[in-house]
Amino acid sequence: MTVDILAFGAHPDDAEIGCGGLLLKLKDRGYRTGIVYLTVGEMGSRGTPEIRRQELTAAAKALGLDYMEVMDFQDCRVVDDFDSRLKIACVVRQQRPTIVLAPYWDGPPGRGVGHTDHQAAGYLVSHGVNFAHLRALPLESEPHSVSNLLYYLFPRELPPSFVVDISDYIDQWVEVLKCHHSQFYNPETTHYDFVDTLVAVARARGVSIGARYAQGFIAPEPLRVDDPFMLVTPRRRTPQYPT
């Protein structure tokens, strides 16, 4: 079986953070969804590889994914080279998604969004998606052309190309995030502090479109629109001040 939308994450929890709400929404609408984790996050400060595998499996179940794969790249050593692109292209050919999601490829280097693996994964998946349609490459499976490549986990100061309302899925999304207990639970406060931060970001993004919660995405090229009225949706009232 193939999927309609396939998200690539450098580590367990990347895709859940950046596009988990979208995946829940699309799954609810009947689309087939999947996530490919490049690494098991073995260099993380908390959580062993075994624990991380258990957590990503739980998250995949909570998301209702139709496909999930953990590849054999090394944490903090994800590289965009020819052989790695072939690996990504193989997955794309096998799963044949219409849309591919990947971490954004640029931004201030360092922790979080600027993690070296996030940026490398952005380049790697972009080139792998391109390789997937090239017939001359020595790959199994028939060539496949992805219709749209979209990016998540981009610097907050960058404007998104479009924003998706995930208000109806916010509670489910939070439960998905909590599956990654080793990463999000703060034993010093006995609370999921980082989850609260992510919800606040989604709240801010939602306000920008008149929704309660939303997630934004960047498209590398203009998105074709045949009927602008298909883009028009009623704005939810999101009061910020007493009236």
Residue ranges and their predicted role:
Residues 1-6, 82-243:
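Metal-dependent de-N-acetylase/amidase catalytic core
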Residues 1-96, 230-237:
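Active-site rim/loop-helix segments in enzyme catalytic domains that contact anionic ligands
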